[in-house]
């Protein structure tokens, strides 16, 4: 097998409409044309799933995923103002990262690499 690309990331939520609104209005990601429970990034779809509606326990994703932003500090303040929890900010010597939790407690990493890989 050869994986061609990542098509979507499934994100648990207790309220699909609220999750879509947060990622659309705060992160500026457009809603999907094909499914009301999704938003689009330039290279992967974020798909929201209400596990409790399917009779499953809700458990937020703690591993997270990273989205590239122009200014990590400014992005962190934007999500904080929208009600998200800021967990921490880190500078690794290669990139800046802001670790936040969305309105459902899912980890989201606001990221900007400033040094080349290597």
What residues fall within each predicted segment?
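Short amphipathic alpha-helices within nucleic acid-binding modules
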Residues: 22, 73-78
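Amphipathic alpha-helical segments
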Residues: 15-30
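Vicinal oxygen chelate
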Residues: 1-2, 11, 76, 80-118
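Conserved short beta-strand elements that form part of the metal-binding/catalytic scaffold
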Residues: 28-62, 107-113
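Helix N-cap motif at beta-to-alpha junctions
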Residues: 15-16, 70-73
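Short hydrophobic/aromatic beta-strand element in the GNAT-like acyltransferase core
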Residues: 38, 66, 97-99
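Residue-level marker for the onset of beta-strands and adjacent loop->beta junctions
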Residues: 7, 34-35, 63, 85, ...
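N-terminal beta-strand motif that seeds the catalytic metal site of vicinal oxygen chelate
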Residues: 1-17, 45, 62-65, 114-118
């Amino acid at each position: 097998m050869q994986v061609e690309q990542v098509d979507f990331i499934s994100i648990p939520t207790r309220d699909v409409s609220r999750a879509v609104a947060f990622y659309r209005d705060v992160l500026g990601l457009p809603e999907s044309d094909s499914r009301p429970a999704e938003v689009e990034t330039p290279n992967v779809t974020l798909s929201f799933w209400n596990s409790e509606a399917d009779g499953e326990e809700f458990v937020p994703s703690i591993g997270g995923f990273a989205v590239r932003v122009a200014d990590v500090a400014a992005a962190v303040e934007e999500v904080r103002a929208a009600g998200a929890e800021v967990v921490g900010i880190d500078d690794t010597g290669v990139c800046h990262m802001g670790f936040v939790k969305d309105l459902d407690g899912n980890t989201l990493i606001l990221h900007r690499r400033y040094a080349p890989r290597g």
